[in-house]
Amino acid sequence: MKIHEYQGKDILRQFGVPVPRGIPAFTVQEAVEAAQKLGGPVWVVKAQIHAGGRGKGGGVQLAKTIDEVRRLAGSMLGMQLKTHQTGPEGQKVRRLYIEEGADIGKEYYLSIVTDRATQKLAFIASSEGGMDIEEVKRAKPEMIITEFVDPLAGLGPEQALKIAVGIGLPAPAQAQAQAVDIMRRLYQCYMDTDASLLEINPLNCDGQNRLTALDAKFNFDANALWRHPEIVAYRDFEEEDPAEVLASKFDLAYISMDGNIGCLVNGAGLAMATMDTIKLFGGAPANFLDVGGGATAEKVTEAFKIMLGNPKVKGILVNIFGGIMRCDTIATGVISACKAVNLSVPLVVRMKGTNEEPGKKLLAESGLPIIAADTMADAAQRIVAAVR
């Protein structure tokens, strides 16, 4: 789950991480009132969307007068902000964050992610803050350092100091001591909130060697949200794909993609293999959709409705391996779904495993124009051919 920058900064404040003062605004008038409350002489007007690269897209701008705040707020609210993370369609700006201006000095990058390979937390840092870290990795990989932290031991002061020195934070004891303190607070924040990503870009060091987090990006582990109702309250459904939100209500794992072949599969691994096979034979998947091991006829019907809600879908591939899941249950769901949505696009079904033969019999006797396939490769080839 993602949250907005201003919400992330609320969390950082709770953990004692220094951030500029700021106030969220949903209207132009609220933006003006926020600037007046904060006081001048400079404000930063920030569009709030769940995507990076806002500055390059015109979503982060300085204002030196209240009239400028009003003008910028009026132009940003409602705009389709396009960044390298939004795609060509952009994302609509519905919220702003009005923040006090900062004395910009040297900018650094800090982030924490979980590294599955080492089974540790990776503390990633760079002296090239304020830039896209992927761009830094490509152009100046030597400017990025990674320190692995054992979650059983935690981030000790010696590791934090090693990171601070490694990215060239200024030598005065005050600055390095503050850097160590901030990193340890960020680590505690990451652990206590069950985050899967915590990114500060940039961490600003001003002319007096004071450090401030000028941006905050969080992702949270969806499997741990049940114990964080305060974080769930931050969720902004308007920033999410409506199809993905609807799918979550039926316990379906759904992610939209850019192709034209809908995929309904049980199991994340099989779903990814299915999409790869479609690509191998020249097709393009329109979605990732895992119905899980406890799918019912109702869930299958809802899955079909969600897939067909995408106008780009020109065909559907159902690929089921019946272990816990019974193939006849899926077949019943597929038949019900076809009738419920009045299916008008090609449908290929491949089923193997538990109750495979009864499932195939149900499909064959349904009277529906379902294309049967025996292997995953056969299924992929058939659906790719059908949508051409």
UniProtKB/Swiss-Prot annotation:
Residue positions binding substrate: N266, G323, I324, M325
The keyword Oxidoreductase is annotated on this UniProt entry: no
Catalyzed chemical reaction(s): succinate + ATP + CoA = succinyl-CoA + ADP + phosphate; GTP + succinate + CoA = succinyl-CoA + GDP + phosphate
Residues the record lists as binding Mg(2+): N201, D215
CC terms in the record's Gene Ontology section: cytosol; succinate-CoA ligase complex
Pathways per UniProt: Carbohydrate metabolism; tricarboxylic acid cycle; succinate from succinyl-CoA (ligase route): step 1/1
Similarity comment: Belongs to the succinate/malate CoA ligase beta subunit family.
EC number: 6.2.1.5
Pfam families: ATP-grasp_2, Ligase_CoA
PANTHER family in UniProt: SUCCINATE--COA LIGASE [GDP-FORMING] SUBUNIT BETA, MITOCHONDRIAL, SUCCINYL-COA SYNTHETASE BETA CHAIN
Molecular function GO terms recorded: ATP binding; magnesium ion binding; succinate-CoA ligase (ADP-forming) activity; succinate-CoA ligase (GDP-forming) activity
GO biological process: succinyl-CoA metabolic process; tricarboxylic acid cycle
Protein name: Succinate--CoA ligase [ADP-forming] subunit beta
Enzyme class: ligase
Matches recorded under HAMAP family: Succ_CoA_beta
Co-factor(s): Mg(2+)
Keywords: ATP-binding, Ligase, Magnesium, Metal-binding, Nucleotide-binding, Tricarboxylic acid cycle
Function in brief: Succinyl-CoA synthetase functions in the citric acid cycle (TCA), coupling the hydrolysis of succinyl-CoA to the synthesis of either ATP or GTP and thus represents the only step of substrate-level phosphorylation in the TCA. The beta subunit provides nucleotide specificity of the enzyme and binds the substrate succinate, while the binding sites for coenzyme A and phosphate are found in the alpha subunit.
Subunit structure and binding partners: Heterotetramer of two alpha and two beta subunits.
Manner of cofactor binding, per the entry note: Binds 1 Mg(2+) ion per subunit.
Domain of life, per lineage: Bacteria
The organism of origin for this protein: Verminephrobacter eiseniae (strain EF01-2)
UniProt-annotated binding residues for ATP: K46, G53, R54, G55, E99, A102, E107
Sequence ranges assigned to domain ATP-grasp in this UniProt record: 9-246
Claim: ATP-binding is one of the keywords in the record: yes
